[in-house]
Amino acid sequence: NGEADIAIANSYYIGIMLSGSAGEDQLTAAKKVRMIFPNQDNRGTHINISGAGILKNSPNPTNANLFLEFLLSKRVQKYMVDKSYEYPIVDGVLPSKEIASFGISFKEDQTSVQKYGELNPDAVRLMDRSGWK
């Protein structure tokens, strides 16, 4: 029936639901949950990233760099946070009101993204062994 005492979700899904853009039933459901940022007394909360980069063999690194600078402009960051309900990466850009409603100040886990890649095969083996699907 979709009820649970606790769930794990990316913050932007709750932002979309709170915005009302996913429909009235999603808005009603979102109003029944509370966001909690775990591990604030130790390592911090896991964060996902949406990233962009330039390949070392890119045929047009100058324009690729200009595009990245464009993505990091305050104007584009504001547009992105208002449409994607993700946290901004640029100082001085505030998150959407939906995201801000459950907090903008929390301790982030500083684990290197590279480490996630290194440990991925072990994580997959653990999930396979446990029968996780």
Model-identified regions with their sequence ranges:
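Ligand-binding pocket segment of bilobal, Venus flytrap-like solute-binding proteins
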Residues: N1-P38
